[in-house]
């Protein structure tokens, strides 16, 4: 790989603008990245990060007037091939691999080695396998070039994408939310690899909503807001307050602050005793009180989501009892749960929660449209007003209620789904990874909604893999391990809710876990 002078920018994007019909996505944005630098790019959803990266990758063409320079020389990137030839590689959140091809075939895609007569010769798969062995070994891959990509884990597939970038001699590597599907161990391995690539002189643009990752990796951080460049901070000047203020343009004080009164331990809303599904959930019990926010933490695979779906009636129970308001609740289906005042926000809003091709109005109304029936016909005006009220109450950013929900940012999609649940007037709300894939501003608004619900006497269960979030919003925390509740923190236990205590309980790694249990 060609080495560049680290004191000179490798990439300069100057005055980049992009206009879509009726929307100005970027307005004169500039970005400078040096070789051997991890440069994070932050901003709320809709700030323009993806548009800027798609211009760099050749997927979009910028408006006239801006320019892109590599090693100080202006360059035209008029398509993905031009970006690749310029040394730019992008690893998107949705990986771009062919699962039915081998690792080597994916690495060489579009550059296949052939026998005989140039482009018309037969593909030389053996030569391609030999040709990518070195890069796989260099990156620490424990799979071979002839492995089918479809048999690899998400983390391994991500490694194939990185190997392809390195093999094409990319000098600028863009990574868009790369840790979203990864476990903690896989994330650590990815960070080790990113630092290795930085040491080799690559310029890395890293996009993430996760503050902890930004602090751990970044040499510098640039912030976009509403399609405009706000500023760049060096590592030494990073702080949550400054970053959040730059991203949202307003003060978000007390980001995780509990703003509801202490719950009444005598007002029990939900009681779960020894429930099991015959698989992941192996006998769990919990209590939830009116006005309480109960956090559920644990490692991936601990059974948190499965427990939530079991309580909600989305999965059958093989044993155990659930009481809602002191009365036994059969919970044979989600409809039963909703009718009883118990609702569940799924962790996968796009596949299990929202109707992406339907409007915001219809998504909000779909659980309560029966209320609008008059003589066999729906009162559309009433449903439209309900949607407008929900949009205002939850600060959903949409031009109008008839826009397709699939066109919204992740944070606004999440608030549409929350609106639908809240229209049922629940007594108990289970939120499974409520801020996954949403930006800082939307997170703050979701935390406000949680606090408002608790103040109104709703019992809220929050399942989250982000420990600062769990610690910040929850009155008590239950930690799951291997399908069971391993212990409880906060509340009557007196045990402080800390990251160390949660990890100890989740892993069973210390006597602290046993003591808390």
From Swiss-Prot:
Keywords: ATP-binding, Cell inner membrane, Cell membrane, Membrane, Nucleotide-binding, Repeat, Sugar transport, Translocase, Transport. Its EC number is 7.5.2.7. It comes from the Bacteria. It catalyses: D-ribose(out) + ATP + H2O = D-ribose(in) + ADP + phosphate + H(+). One of its GO terms (molecular function) is ABC-type D-ribose transporter activity. Pfam families: ABC_tran. InterPro entries: AAA+_ATPase (IPR003593), ABC_carbohydrate_import_ATPase (IPR050107), ABC_transporter-like_ATP-bd (IPR003439), ABC_transporter-like_CS (IPR017871), P-loop_NTPase (IPR027417). ATP binds at residues 43-50. SMART domains: AAA. It is a peripheral membrane protein. PROSITE patterns: ABC_TRANSPORTER_1, ABC_TRANSPORTER_2, RBSA. Residues 11-251, 263-507 form the ABC transporter domain. One of its GO terms (cellular component) is plasma membrane. The keyword Lyase does not apply. The keyword Cell inner membrane applies. SUPFAM superfamilies: P-loop containing nucleoside triphosphate hydrolases. It is found in: Cell inner membrane. The complex is composed of an ATP-binding protein (RbsA), two transmembrane proteins (RbsC) and a solute-binding protein (RbsB). Belongs to the ABC transporter superfamily. Ribose importer (TC 3.A.1.2.1) family. Part of the ABC transporter complex RbsABC involved in ribose import. Responsible for energy coupling to the transport system. This is Ribose import ATP-binding protein RbsA 2.
